């Protein structure tokens, strides 16, 4: 499984081996396509492609690859219920790369799963500042407000 994940991450890194401007242009184009499409399966495919781009650190160097590996490790920990360890790992990634929206989003998710809704909202706020179109963060924001019974938000 670990070898498959590394191959997947490496292939995504190669696929998205573009500078930040190219990456942003690709995201812009995907969001335009997403807005225009009327087909559910096309929309889901575009959504998946956007999420895959977000999961890969935008830097095309060894450091970016390592941060991407750490993010996937944190996701595995989170999915395995090791929330404290996942939180620590996402915090480490954020300390190294505070401008990577997906690291903030993943930590917000862990905080939500730990019932720390206000802290999760704080991380979501940063996620959305870095990537205002982050539909996963917007969804997480709604879930946090529901848990806090702040339905008006």
Residue ranges and their predicted role:
Residues 93, 126-127:
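Canonical positions in the second alpha-helix
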């Amino acid at each position: 499984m670990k070898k498959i994940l590394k191959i997947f991450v490496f292939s995504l890194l190669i696929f998205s081996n573009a500078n930040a401007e190219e990456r942003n242009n690709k995201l812009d184009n995907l969001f335009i396509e997403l807005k225009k499409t009327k087909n559910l399966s096309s929309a889901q495919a575009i959504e998946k492609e956007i999420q895959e781009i977000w999961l890969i650190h935008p830097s095309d160097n060894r450091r970016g690859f390592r941060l991407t590996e750490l993010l996937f490790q944190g996701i595995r920990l989170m999915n395995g219920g090791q929330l404290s360890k996942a939180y620590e790992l996402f915090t480490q990634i954020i300390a190294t790369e505070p401008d990577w929206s997906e690291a903030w989003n993943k930590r917000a998710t862990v905080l939500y799963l730990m019932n720390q809704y206000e802290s999760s909202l704080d991380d979501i706020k940063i996620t959305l500042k870095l990537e205002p179109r982050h539909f996963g963060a917007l969804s997480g924001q709604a879930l946090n407000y529901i848990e806090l019974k702040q339905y008006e938000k």
